[in-house]
């Protein structure tokens, strides 16, 4: 293959990805039934024809790249590297394909002296592994950390390195090590603090000073990320990461004391501007969390400040995205503020009825944001992860009156946003209710002993309860797919082995999600078991025995319907 063929392949592929985004966006536009169905048919037809086209294209292109010695000249290899970085920087990209490209280039450049090319490869591998680690923690989290660390140690020779792209990569690696990798747990607080000290050394070095005029973006980014860790270190140390996978980080008392001192000094010197900026929401929420944890302010005081700020700035929020091309900041604004508001709301002393009223208000804010969100910004995976944190924040469940309200909340946030997942869950639910209705009418003895029913007459007496349980279980059976929907809904090309491995983790992921609340925990076994064989001797996950579950009957029903 020559460089022009490679360039054209990836240019065509980007066109396909853009079209996929447009079709997905069309499914979210409010319209009448006929218009919506027409959009659904157009989407299905595109995937049907494009899958065949891309499958043929992939089979003609990828095997050549995957050979031990691909038949590519220097220009072709250079174009492959350029295409990889174009994908890396694009709003729309394909993580699995990006990872495959990086692996191919890694074999080619691995033993060369081309530092810029190899750093591009390492940066891409770090990024793709980091994103996959948000779905399946290991082995991707450790790989991401190791690739970022490999890049960051290049800072020791910062002055001798002439390539601007390598300088940029060093700063990006540092930022992800002290923030993303720390949040995900692959970097300890002690390690993050030591890496931050390295960042400050680089920030004050003559080597960086010499590049501040010629490469202003490098110094500016390092300044931003060094300061960001200063504001977020306390929250990281206190494990404010409240997803269902949050884990206790042991931080030595002397380090915790040092972090608290640095944070207090920072906020004492901070001069907040009168006009709220796009960055102020991070500062305000972080300071409130710090003040509350250290006894400086009450939950009521912190909630009031964030609530007032949010109401004042919300009308201007879209300007943040217009000013900053990283429209991802709009997601961060909404999710950071709403997460903090709900967190403090639970802890306030206000009457429960008032808490529930504000919580309903915040739920509507979330729904309005999702409805207005421009899917063409290319950050839907980031939005999925943010919504996941809000949907599965355990303390919030104290503000619901019924189990049905909890299920509706989850369904709206992490299922109904995605058309195929939404339709699939509804169809499984309809099938399950139909099958169970027939069983109750014709063979009720099959259900004797299930959920404590003692006779066919008892089955009939509990008909409504059984059907409601099946309905809810079906709606939630695939909830573990939320963070991997971009993979699952990849219908324009064959999936890679990497992607299949990630998809197979969704039953356990769903079980983790549903374990956060007593009402939701009733559905854990169904989420975990719906891909197991009836006899328990096949399917996945391997660490779950569906034959020993008290929900075995319902697991089998949902499996058939699925």
Which residues make up each language-model segment?
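Amphipathic alpha-helical repeat scaffolds of TPR domains
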Residues: 7-89, 114-135, 163-186, 212-246, ...
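Helix-turn-helix repeat elements of alpha-solenoid scaffolds
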Residues: 10-19, 33-62, 86-108, 136-157, ...
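Solenoid-like repeat scaffolds
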Residues: 66-70, 107-114, 156-165, 201-208, ...
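Non-transmembrane, amphipathic alpha-helical segments
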Residues: 136, 298-301, 322-326, 350-354, ...
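Divalent metal-dependent phosphate-bond-processing catalytic cores, especially two-metal-ion Mg2+/Mn2+ enzymes
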Residues: 163, 201-213, 236-241, 245, ...
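Histidine/acidic-rich helix-loop-helix segments that form or flank divalent-metal centers
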Residues: 167, 219, 223, 450-474, ...
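Acidic/His-rich, divalent-metal-binding segments that scaffold phosphate/diphosphate chemistry
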Residues: 372-501
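Short amphipathic alpha-helical segments
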Residues: 425-433, 511, 524, 528
């Amino acid at each position: 293959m020559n460089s022009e063929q490679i360039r054209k392949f990836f240019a065509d592929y980007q066109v396909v990805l853009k079209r996929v985004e447009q079709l997905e966006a069309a499914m979210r536009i409010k319209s009448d039934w006929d218009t919506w169905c027409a959009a659904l048919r157009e989407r299905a037809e595109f995937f049907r024809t494009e899958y065949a086209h891309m499958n043929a294209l992939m089979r003609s292109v990828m095997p050549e790249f995957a050979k031990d010695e691909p038949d590519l000249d220097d220009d072709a290899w250079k174009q492959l590297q350029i295409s990889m970085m174009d994908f890396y920087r694009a709003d729309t990209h394909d993580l699995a394909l990006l990872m495959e490209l990086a692996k191919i280039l890694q074999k080619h450049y691995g033993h060369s002296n081309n530092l810029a090319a190899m750093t591009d490869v390492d940066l891409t591998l770090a990024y793709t592994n980091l994103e996959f680690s948000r779905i399946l923690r290991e082995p991707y989290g450790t790989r991401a950390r190791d690739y970022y660390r490999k890049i960051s140690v290049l800072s020791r020779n910062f002055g001798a390195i002439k390539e601007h792209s390598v300088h940029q990569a060093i700063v990006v690696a540092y930022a992800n090590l002290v923030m993303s990798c720390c949040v995900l747990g692959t970097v300890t607080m002690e390690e993050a603090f030591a890496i931050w000290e390295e960042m400050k050394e680089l920030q004050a070095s003559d080597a960086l000073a010499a590049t501040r005029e010629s490469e202003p973006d490098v110094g500016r980014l390092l300044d931003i990320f060094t300061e960001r860790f200063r504001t977020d270190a306390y929250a990281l140390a206190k494990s404010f990461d409240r997803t269902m996978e949050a884990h206790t980080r042991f931080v030595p008392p002397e380090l915790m004391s040092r972090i608290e001192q640095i944070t207090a000094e920072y906020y004492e010197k901070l001069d907040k501007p009168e006009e709220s900026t796009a960055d102020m929401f991070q500062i305000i929420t972080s300071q409130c969390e710090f003040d509350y944890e250290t006894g400086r302010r009450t939950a009521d005081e912190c909630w009031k400040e964030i609530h007032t700020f949010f109401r004042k700035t919300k009308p201007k929020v879209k300007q943040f995205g217009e000013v900053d091309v990283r429209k991802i900041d709009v997601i961060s604004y909404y999710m950071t503020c709403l997460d903090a508001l709900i967190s403090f709301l639970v802890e306030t002393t206000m009457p429960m009825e008032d808490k529930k009223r504000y919580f309903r208000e915040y739920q509507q804010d979330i729904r309005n944001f999702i409805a207005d969100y421009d899917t063409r910004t290319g950050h839907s995976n980031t939005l999925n992860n943010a919504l996941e944190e809000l949907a599965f924040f355990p303390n919030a469940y104290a503000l619901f009156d019924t189990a049905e309200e909890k299920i509706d909340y989850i369904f709206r946030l992490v299922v109904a946003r995605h058309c195929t997942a939404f339709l699939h869950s509804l169809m499984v639910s309809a099938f399950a209710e139909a099958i169970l209705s027939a069983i109750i009418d014709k063979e009720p003895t099959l259900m004797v002993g299930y959920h404590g029913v003692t006779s066919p007459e008892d089955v009939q007496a509990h008909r409504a309860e059984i059907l409601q349980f099946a309905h809810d279980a079906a709606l939630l059976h695939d909830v573990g797919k939320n963070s991997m929907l971009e993979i699952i809904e990849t219908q324009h090309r064959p999936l890679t082995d990497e992607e299949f491995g990630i998809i197979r983790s969704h039953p356990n992921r769903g079980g983790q999600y549903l374990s956060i609340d007593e009402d939701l925990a009733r559905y854990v076994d169904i989420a975990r078991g719906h891909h197991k064989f009836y006899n328990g001797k096949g399917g996945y996950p391997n660490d779950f025995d569906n034959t020993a579950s008290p929900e075995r009957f319902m697991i089998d029903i949902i499996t058939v319907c699925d």
